[in-house]
Regions:
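AAA+ P-loop NTPase nucleotide-binding core of proteostasis motors
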Residues: 1-337
């Protein structure tokens, strides 16, 4: 367990306590033999890592993970996809290994949107009640089209031993006056936390059905990322976009790329202003390096280094190139000194 926690923290920044709690709860649920109290409510704003944590955790545990967009779920008889469709996809993805499928982590993502007042119609309420049935443990029958036979092959899939996570931003809950810590409604990791919402608050404010009470005993809220968190993601995460860009320049142009400290700070600042968490980092880094990448690949072998400064983040053509010959002279002079 400690090894898995460390691996997650090497990638996901700003959620140390929350990772500890989630991994511990998952281990407890896996060892739970009575099939009760296995629902987790995982909340957090856009881009804080809800889906990524779940997929990585499943990878490290060597179990399947299926993330289902709850907004796309419909009741039988309505146009759209139902739970059986997603279970069929999972079954085929796992090469029809039923034992693995029935041990999977199932994430019902954006469940708050399905339960919002705008969508809380007969269909929306029906879908949420279906999810609670899924959580309680039931069986679904999926039909597979087999090439060798004219009729569908029926497969029964039990959810009794699946780990079920309800995921969403639930911004209407966390932006409620009694839970906000500043006038913007965002909570930074270094800000003092007010009282945490209870499941009753999610029912009253977040439009979860009353039947949720008692079924989601574990509530984990991922922190909204601060500007410093975003900077640390760039500098320290093993999935940092800067790391990938450095590899790209090295592999495709045989050139090093260096970001000044001020450039890192500006990228984090621009991403923070967008309030979409870590998701915006990739686009900002990509846009800031696009013209430099095009130049060094067009003139392959000519340049040894690219320097990205704070000015490059706002003016993407404003970067510095170090030719290979000049770099050789600089290295020679250093040795002489």
């Amino acid at each position: 367990r400690k090894n898995i926690i460390k691996k997650l923290k090497d990638i996901i920044i700003g959620q140390d306590d929350e990772i500890d709690q989630l991994v511990t709860e998952i281990f407890r649920l896996q060892n739970n033999q009575n099939g009760k109290n296995k629902g987790i409510l995982l909340s957090g704003s856009t881009g804080v890592g809800k889906s990524r944590i779940c997929t990585l955790l499943a990878k490290y545990l060597d179990i399947p993970c299926k993330i289902i967009d709850t907004t796309q779920l419909t009741m039988p008889g309505y146009r759209g996809q139902n739970i059986e469709d997603f279970l069929e996809q999972l079954y085929l993805d796992e090469r029809k290994n039923l034992k693995r499928v029935e041990k999977a982590i199932i994430v019902f993502d954006e469940v708050d949107k399905k339960g919002s007042r705008d969508n809380y119609d007969v269909s929306g309420k029906g879908v949420l009640n279906q999810l609670l049935k899924f959580l309680d443990g039931t069986e679904y029958t999926i039909g597979l089209n087999e090439e060798s036979v004219l009729q569908k092959t029926k497969v029964r899939i039990s959810t009794n031993n699946m780990i079920v996570i309800f995921s969403g931003a639930f911004s209407n809950v966390y932006n409620a006056p009694k839970f906000t810590t500043n006038n913007l409604g965002f909570r930074e990791t270094n800000a003092p936390k007010s009282k945490e919402p209870t499941l009753q608050d999610f029912i009253d404010i977040g439009c979860l059905p009353d039947e949720s009470m008692g079924r989601l005993p574990i509530i984990i809220h991922l922190n909204t990322l601060s500007e410093n968190d975003l900077k640390n993601i760039l500098l320290h995460s093993k999935e940092s976009d800067i790391y990938y860009v450095k590899q790209e320049f090295k592999n495709e142009a045989e050139a090093d790329i260096k970001f000044s400290d001020e450039a890192i700070e500006e990228i984090a600042h621009q991403a923070y202003l967008l309030q979409t968490g870590a998701r915006s980092l990739q686009k900002i880094v990509h846009d800031a390096t696009y013209h430099a990448f095009k130049k060094v690949t067009d003139d392959f072998g000519k340049y040894s280094k690219v320097i990205i400064t704070k000015d490059t983040i706002t003016d993407h053509k404003n970067y510095t190139l170090i030719p290979k010959e000049q770099n050789k002279v600089l290295q020679k002079n250093k040795k002489m000194l």
